[in-house]
């Protein structure tokens, strides 16, 4: 049975670079003989975190069906890829909210980060690595893609081939880390 990689997007924008990159990431996962499952933040309908209990509390079980679906996808994945934009040097609030809804689901999960933006998503990468380590996940690889150098602002790869190379390198690292 092929390994399952969950890809968690990070932008609510319908024309985001992440939406443009997602098919390339999915294809690269499938080319590595793995299954790609997507948690699309834009369509997942996750509410802002508003539970009276924290996910780190013993016995926490979210009651919202959208959160339950997200939790199940993360919990059953063999590894994850965080496809995240960088907004003002930070990870997106929508992706942070999705992360905040979960706790034990992240434990010991290998995670790769594909960040994108004007500065290759370095600020978002650093935040995600720190946050994922705090949640006891295993961030094992990160790649940054720069607008107008590696990808267009809509996520289309530029002729350099850097985007595809970076994504393939990240996925190969994840395969070794599972």
Task: Give, region by region, the residue ranges found by the protein language model.
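N-terminal beta1-alpha1-beta2 submodule of the flavodoxin-like/Rossmannoid cofactor-binding fold
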Residues: 1-84, 90-97, 157-176
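Glycine-rich NAD(P)-binding loop of Rossmann-like domains
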Residues: 4, 106-108, 155
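Hydrophobic/aromatic ligand-binding patch that stacks against planar heteroaromatic rings
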Residues: 28, 103, 131
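Mobile beta-alpha loop/short-helix "lid" or hinge segments that flank ligand
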Residues: 39-50, 134-155
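Glycine-rich nucleotide phosphate-binding loop and flanking beta-alpha elements
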Residues: 88-89, 120
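Rossmann-fold NAD(P) dinucleotide-binding segment
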Residues: 92-108
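Short, glycine-/small-residue-rich phosphate/pyrophosphate-handling segment
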Residues: 107-148, 162
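Structural signal for hydrophobic packing residues in well-ordered secondary-structure cores
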Residues: 132, 136, 171-178
């Amino acid at each position: 049975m092929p390994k399952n990689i969950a890809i968690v997007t990070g932008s609510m924008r319908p024309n985001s670079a992440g939406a443009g990159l997602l098919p390339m990431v999915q294809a690269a996962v499938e080319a590595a003989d793995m299954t790609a499952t997507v948690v699309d933040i834009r369509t997942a309908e996750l509410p802002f975190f508003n539970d009276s209990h924290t996910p780190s509390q013993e016995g926490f079980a979210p009651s919202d069906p959208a959160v339950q679906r997200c939790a199940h996808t993360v919990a059953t994945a063999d590894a994850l890829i965080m496809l995240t934009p960088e907004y003002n040097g930070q990870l997106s609030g929508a992706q942070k909210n999705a992360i905040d809804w979960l706790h034990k689901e992240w434990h010991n999960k290998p995670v790769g980060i594909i960040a994108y933006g004007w500065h290759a998503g370095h600020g978002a990468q650093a935040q995600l690595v720190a946050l994922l380590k705090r949640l006891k996940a295993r961030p094992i690889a990160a790649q940054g893609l720069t607008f107008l150098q590696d990808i267009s602002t809509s996520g289309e790869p530029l002729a350099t081939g850097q985007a595809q190379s970076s994504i393939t390198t990240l996925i190969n690292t994840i395969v070794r880390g599972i």
